């Protein structure tokens, strides 16, 4: 005899009050990930995924749009307060933080977590334009 089909349960959205926004700003792209305190991702967005291609991905405006998209998606979880971790030397660092502030989040702290080598790998050669 066949088993009765299990009813698909509705996935319950958990509510999170405090979160962390990780902004990875490289020279070519900007990635914004919003997580809870344990590091579980709630939402994310990138400049490339926001419709920008090529050299337009690495602009401050593209980082702003990506941060707005990630911020709006994380509002569904009831997020209010954010700590911001900024990593990398890219042009979208400040504009992404400003966009998250404009989404209505209360930003408690902004931390620069850019990894700095203790004379590790050899850097790329200088550009000759």
UniProtKB/Swiss-Prot annotation:
Biological processes annotated in GO: translation
Keywords linked to the UniProt accession: Ribonucleoprotein, Ribosomal protein, RNA-binding, rRNA-binding
Record's keyword annotation contains Ribosomal protein: yes
Cellular component per GO, a single term: ribosome
InterPro entries: Ribosomal_uS11, Ribosomal_uS11_bac-type, Ribosomal_uS11_CS, Ribosomal_uS11_sf
Assembly, per entry: Part of the 30S ribosomal subunit. Interacts with proteins S7 and S18. Binds to IF-3.
UniProt similarity note: Belongs to the universal ribosomal protein uS11 family.
PANTHER family: 40S RIBOSOMAL PROTEIN S14/30S RIBOSOMAL PROTEIN S11
The name this protein goes by in its record: Small ribosomal subunit protein uS11
Species per Swiss-Prot/TrEMBL record: Pseudomonas paraeruginosa (strain DSM 24068 / PA7) (Pseudomonas aeruginosa (strain PA7))
Gene that this polypeptide is encoded by: rpsK
């Amino acid at each position: 005899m066949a088993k009765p089909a299990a009813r698909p349960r509705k996935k319950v959205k958990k509510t999170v009050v405090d979160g962390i926004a990780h902004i990875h700003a490289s020279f070519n792209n900007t990635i914004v990930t919003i997580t809870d305190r344990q590091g579980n991702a709630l939402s994310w967005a990138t400049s490339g995924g926001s419709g920008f291609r090529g050299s337009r991905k690495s602009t401050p405006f593209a980082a702003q749009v990506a941060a707005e998209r990630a911020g709006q998606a994380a509002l569904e979880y009831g997020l209010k307060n954010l700590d911001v971790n900024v990593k990398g030397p890219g042009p979208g660092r400040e504009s992404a933080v400003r966009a998250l502030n404009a989404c209505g989040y209360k930003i408690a702290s902004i931390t620069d977590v850019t990894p700095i080598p203790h004379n590790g790998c050899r850097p790329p050669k200088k550009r000759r334009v």
